[in-house]
Amino acid sequence: MILSKPILLSAVQPSGNLTIGNYIGTMRHWSKMQNNYECLYCIADLHALTIQKNKIHLNKSILDTISFYLSCGVDPQKSIIFIQSHVYQHSQLNWILNCFSQFSELLRMTQFKIKSNCSKKINAALFNYPILMAADILLYQTNFVPVGQDQKQHVELTRNIAHRFNSLYGHVFTLPKPLITQHGSKIMSLLEPSKKMSKSDINKKNVIFLLDDIKTVISKIQNAYTDSETPSKIYYDIEKKPGISNLLEILSAITNKDIDILLKELEGMLYSEFKNIVADHLSKFLYKLQKSYNDYRNDEVYLKKIAYEGAMKSQLKSNKTLTKVYDKLGLIPLF
């Protein structure tokens, strides 16, 4: 008897150039995940509409994101890569789950609080964002969702909604679990290491973009915040050494070395020497990634073929869950 692999869903918004934080937090794990999980990789273009309405930019970003999936080792023969809006079941289940969600639950979502405090022009979709995320997850009977600490609350909300529905109608949804790595799941801003690195940061010197040219990467690392301790002391302590710790996280991820091993190699170095090492390794890493990315990105016919095949497979899987939901609620399916 062949045991089926647990199901894993990972989604990325096509809302602009991805960062080294995106890579270290999620993307670097994509290739290995295929060995242990049945993986679905989603380009969350509907989520992107909460903040982006530019047609040309969104269209380009969707194909960019598929290229990043492929360049990071996702194999379309092993996994499913699909565009969220191609699978209509996401929107259908989204509305149904809204009917089983509490207004007070959504008000407690930390990410919404942060974003609503930053702008008065908040649309309703941003408020309901976690419900669509729940639909994304529950449609595929997902067992695990790789997320950062900032998204963990959304997975917990998804579990609550699923449990609420199951309590009323019997077992329909699998309760998903967040998959969080110990190190590197949250890369911080280069100049302000007290806040998370974000591709939407106004100050681009805070962010390493995956498509930054090499000179820019070196400059950003060399100007990254460390501290004024004399003589230089390189050790890992997020509270006392946020800048140093952040650079150690980056170096550890791209070299595949434990931080403890790196600290022995870096012992006695000046901060400037440490930064040069980080910049050198990061530049070489990004050069290889960018070459692979560009090879895929230059073949849009292939990218659209991948998206089409992924949509067909995703619709078959998601429709099984949606049919169960319709049956439990007394809705009449089209077929």
From Swiss-Prot:
InterPro entries per the UniProt record, alphabetical: aa-tRNA-synth_I_CS, aa-tRNA-synth_Ic, Rossmann-like_a/b/a_fold, Trp-tRNA-ligase, Trp-tRNA-ligase_bac-type, Trp-tRNA_synthetase
User: Which Gene Ontology cellular-component terms appear in the entry?
Assistant: cytosol
Q: What class of enzyme is it?
A: ligase
Q: What is its EC number?
A: 6.1.1.2
Keywords of the record, alphabetical order, are: Aminoacyl-tRNA synthetase, ATP-binding, Cytoplasm, Ligase, Nucleotide-binding, Protein biosynthesis
Give the motif span ('KMSKS' region): 196-200
Q: Where does ATP bind?
A: Q13, P14, S15, G21, N22, G148, Q149, D150, I187, K196, M197, S198, K199, S200
| UniProt superkingdom | Bacteria
* GO MF, any single term: ATP binding
Q: Which reaction does it catalyse?
A: tRNA(Trp) + L-tryptophan + ATP = L-tryptophyl-tRNA(Trp) + AMP + diphosphate + H(+)
Tell me any Pfam family this protein matches.
tRNA-synt_1b
Which locations, inside or outside the cell, does it occupy? Cytoplasm
State where L-tryptophan binds. Answer: D136
An example GO BP is:
tryptophanyl-tRNA aminoacylation
Q: Where is this motif: 'HIGH' region?
A: 14-22
Q: What does this protein do?
A: Catalyzes the attachment of tryptophan to tRNA(Trp).
How it assembles, according to the record, is: Homodimer.
Family per UniProt?
A: Belongs to the class-I aminoacyl-tRNA synthetase family.
Protein's UniProt name: Tryptophan--tRNA ligase
The UniProt gene name for this protein comes to: trpS
